[in-house]
Structures are given as C-alpha cells and as structure tokens.
Amino acid sequence: MAEFPSKVNTRTSSPAQGGGAVVSTLSPDLGFVRSSLGALMLLQLVLGLLVWALIADTPYHLYPSYGWVMFVAVFLWLVTIIFFVLYLFQLHMKLYMVPWPLVLMVFNVGATVLYITAFITCSASVELTSLKGSQPYNQRAAASFFSCLVMIAYGVSAFLSFQAWRGVGSNAATSQMAGGYA
C-alpha cells in the first residue's frame, strides 16, 4: 500500500481584479428580424394581438367559446414573444443543449392546431352571439378573419421549422452555428 506523502506543496492565489465576473451585453440580431422566421414571428405577434384585442373589446366573458379564443390568442402571443426575444438576442445559442429546431417545430405545429380550433370556434360563434351589423358582430367577424391569417402564419412557420429541423437546404453542423433560422 502506498503511504500518504509526508510533505505536500500547496499554493494560494488571490482572485483576479474585478472578481472574475463575466459581463456580456445583449445586442439584437437584426439579421433574425430580416429572416423568414423573424418576419413570420413579427406577423404572428401583430395578428395575434389584433385577434385578442378585438375579442377583448366585446363582452366575451358571457360566451365560453370566446373564452377559448382568448386563451389561445393570449397564450400563444405570450409564448411567441418569448421565442422572439430568445432568437432576437441569440439567447438560444447559450442554451445549446436544447434542440431549438425541434422545439420550434413542435411549438408551431401545436400553435397551428390550437389556432385552427380557435378560428373554427370564433367564426362559428359570430352570428350566434351578436346581431348582424352591430359593433360586437363586426369585431368578432374581424377577429375570425385575423385568426385565420395567424393560423396560416403559424402553419407556414411549422412547415419552415420542419424543414430546418430536417436540415433541408443546410448542413446540420452549420445550421446550429448559423442560429437555426432561414
């Protein structure tokens, strides 16, 4: 058996100037905003805001169907803001262990399905809940139209994120380094 050495050399050192803290500044990636993914996210944010603002301006709480539309619109709007900020400031690059193309594809497919149900619910409830030609009728009809548009925007995003996840048109090694957006 080896014995414990009788003499051990130790060395102490003082911390570096400034405490060793790393400070990095967040700077927006304007290339992301110009990309198809960034432009679609901005479109989803604007259209989603229109949907829930139009519904919120009516007495939607009296009708459960509009409660569902509000839930879908507000929830997906907030999650889209989170994804937009993550990609705009390249925070997704710091969380490299997360498969972002897959996460984005699953989110966009789920958002498309939820907006399909919200669009059907909203458009089917317009005539049942308000008088034709009244302000609530017009607002709910406009919300139905914009929910259809945002549903299409999420569908296009789902298709593009599926292609990014599969690696169509890019090398798998460079797609992670390029930020993962087209």
Curated annotation (Swiss-Prot):
Q: According to Swiss-Prot or TrEMBL, what is its membrane topology?
A: Multi-pass membrane protein
> Which InterPro entries does the record cross-reference, listed alphabetically?
MAL, Marvel, MARVEL-CKLF_proteins
Primary subcellular site in the record, as a coarse category = membrane
What are the record's GO terms for cellular component?
apical plasma membrane; membrane; myelin sheath
Q: How is it modified after translation?
A: Phosphorylated.
Give ranges for the Extracellular compartment. Answer: 57-68, 121-141
Segments passing through the bilayer: 36-56, 69-89, 100-120, 142-162
Look up the domain of life of the source: Eukaryota
Entry keyword set: Cell membrane, Membrane, Transmembrane, Transmembrane helix
Q: Which GO terms describe its biological process?
A: myelination; regulation of endocytosis
Domain named MARVEL: which ranges?
32-166
In alphabetical order, the GO MF annotations are:
structural constituent of myelin sheath
Intervals, Cytoplasmic compartment: 1-35, 90-99, 163-182
Which is one Pfam family of this protein? Answer: MARVEL
Name used for this protein in its record? Plasmolipin
Q: Which gene encodes it?
A: PLLP
